[in-house]
Amino acid sequence: MSMKFLTGLQDLLGLYETGTAASSPASPIPPTSPAMFAVPPQQQSHSAATSVRKKTCQDANSSGEDPNGRIRQCSHARTVSFPADMDLITGYHEAPSSLFHSYHDSQRVIDSSEILTAYREACQRRQCAPSAAVEKQIGYFHKSPDTRQELLSLKGERVSHAQMEALEEIFKRVQFNTIDFEYTFLDDDCAISLGEMIEFYDSCVRLNLSFNKQIDMRGWTTIFRSIRHAVSLQMLNLRYTNLNDRSIPALCKMARAQPSASLTCLHLENTQMSGKNLLVLICALKNNTGLRELYLGDNGLQPTDGSHIYQLITSNSSLQLLDLRNNSIGDSGVRHICDGLRHREAVEKSSLSAMVLWNNNVTGASMDSLAEALIENTKIETLNIGNNNLGVEGIARLKPALASNSHLHRLGLQNTGINCEGAIILAECIADNIALLRVDIRDNPIALAGLLALHSAMKMNTSITLLNIDASCVKLSSEKVREYQDEFERYFREIQTYCDRNKDDVLKRLTVTFDDEEGDSGVEKKDGNECEGEDNKDRQDTPAETENGVSSNESKLENEEVGVSKPESNNNEKSPLMASSSTSKLSRKERHQRFVRSSSLTCTETVHDIHDRLREMSGSTHSLDAAIAAAASNSTMQNLLTVSYGSNPGPLDSSSNSESMKTIKKSFTVTAASSSSLPLAEWGSLPALPQASPSSTPVVRKLRRFSVSPSSSVFDVATTSSAASSTASSPIPENSIALPVRPSTLAIGIPIIGSVPAGPSSAPLILVEDHKDGPITSNQISDTERRISEEIERQKKDEQEIEKSCRSVIRDLLNYVEYEEKSQVERKASLLLRNTFSRPNPEELLRNLRLSEATGSTTPRTPLTPSRYVQVFNINSFLKLYFIKACILRVLEIAEELEGESDEQICQSVIRCLVRDVLQAEKNELRSTLDRRRRHNSVRNSPV
């Protein structure tokens, strides 16, 4: 600093050393053009001095013998050099990527035993029990690394955060078509881990998270972000989940993503997706080009929500299936939807081909709007308006669209109030219709007249391959036509024969034959879904045929439509072969797997225990889990950790996954830590309140990506000792390849089963694993177990002391209350006995009786008069007997009153009185406070 100051002062004053100035040959450079670049004499002298100074400094610095010596003069010409950039980098590594993205090794073989061992060791490290259903499914994995495994299901099991983390050992080695976490009570931590694994490992094509109401905003945010970045995920089932105002923006952000995510099917049944939430979602889906199927059933949609559906139909160009079952849209909402179908944008750009309006309080009044929409919009192929009170009026208004329609293939009219008159109108429509493939008119009061009309219509129809009608229509209601019973049954069977005839005709038109010159065997492929098409026109697959998870009777109906002939080998005959377009569609449909619900004409509920599930999910179960975990003993923990690794699971059959498919129906047993008087529903609604201890040292769970867990919101950067079990996991073989693991910014601490909570701030005592190189010694294991046992013993002693003091206080209170109650009862009893057994005076009673008869008044109440009687007879003997009987009855009542009540009942009554007094005092105080405020306000507001 001082050197720069002196140099600047020297330049300002022009003071230089004499020898240096004299020896300097530098001179100012004259300007090239004196006329244009004339410099005043003062500036010329200053520039000359500056040049002399720079030259002198350069000579002085260059003439030094020691380059590392002390610099005595300033030089602005010195430079700083650095080594080459490549020499600065000592090493680097690529960003972590999953095994399935980094390379493709065709020689790799999936080893089920290795996956099973890794999964068990992961469960052991995280102090949790492995799932028996998962172990069975691991044994069923095929060995091809190029093909995804079919299914990983934990349906109906309680999955904790530790168990979810242990599943990473499976996800890092195997990919699946379907991952089913239905009804597994996932929370935010489980959802965050699952979302990160799905995004990193690209684990599945279809993901089922239905019936999980404990997931909140943090979990949904991670799930939706992972789905937005997932490459293969196509179907997401969020049925009966807790989507609220805070989590819906994350869903909308995923829907607005450009380019659109790979998601094509979204189930949002019973997620409160109505009103504002529905409007926000539809605004996000306006420009979405990837979604094909949207399920919005059981959301309580109102007629006003029909305008939101109108915006979705007119703006979205990729949606093919819209399911609105079990709502309350009504006639006005249906009119809004029909206006959207008739809109010019929808007619030109919309891809909507299937719509489900099952059970929406629709009547026949809105069927004229629906008929006009079907006439103008020629893209609707499947329409299900079942379970609505349409009646004959609705069918009559729908008749113009059904008679002239050439594009509607499937019509659902189940339980719509169609009688014989409606069946006759419907028969008139289908007689000449060449587009309908399936009509469902089950659960309607159709009798013999309707059956005859449908029989005549099906005799002329050439397109319908399946007509669903109840067999009860054949039953005769009159004895006069009993002799025609066999004939009516024959008509019913002939309807099925006509359907089979139409199916065979379509198959014949879709097949071609050729001469087999090389002698290869000929194979005829037939598919009922393909026979539902037009002649040789390549139609687009409708969602109703490629739906997931149909009910039992629906599967039977679909199977009736499908006919596959066995391969026949004949070298001399002609071999029929399906057309190329049909073959491609057949293979495409065979690859599509059924997963959840059916969107075809049958909309009955497929979950048989849905009411039990809803009752179980009505309250939070974290308190139950905490109580059960806290009550687990060390012996139970050792049994969970010492899992037999030698047993290899056998191959799975159809019933091997029965454990995971069962729904949780067991009642939870609460240990001594919880009161047994409370029912299950009340325990489900209570929050988790860990016990407090005097010395509290909150220990922290460190979560990846800096996410905060609601169960432990107190954080500490200090690490704790590592927790290891006696049965240490076997080391990984040296020849095994280290699989890449998804990145985690922070370590995760998993609580040990049986650990006690510590701290008044309800932060649980959690041991965080310290992943270090090298094996775990026996000394570390013994120290850890000793510390845990000491902590448990100390906590038990504190609890015993607190319980002892509480018992003593309660005992004193009970003794005092019992004494007060007994003394009061005894005083009352003595008074009553004294009054009752006092000697009666007959003369006085007779005098009072005569006086009452003269005046017409009733007998006065005296201590000698019994309370139960109001009249005294004038017979002395009867009076004596009467008084003796009254005294005996009163004595018996007092004895029963004294002996009937137990100590517990007395305590309960006293406690009720105390609580009632406290509440009454608070009520009076609140009332007086309000009165004072009113008086104060009235005085302040009164005019002066």
UniProtKB/Swiss-Prot annotation:
Residues 586-595 have a biased composition (Basic residues). Residues 42-71, 517-598 are annotated as: Disordered. The keyword Acetylation does not apply. Pfam families: LRR_6. It comes from the Eukaryota. Coiled coil: none annotated. The keyword Repeat applies. Keywords: Leucine-rich repeat, Repeat. PANTHER family: LEUCINE-RICH REPEAT, ISOFORM F-RELATED, PROTEIN PHOSPHATASE 1 REGULATORY SUBUNIT 37. This is Protein phosphatase 1 regulatory subunit 37 homolog. It comes from Caenorhabditis elegans.
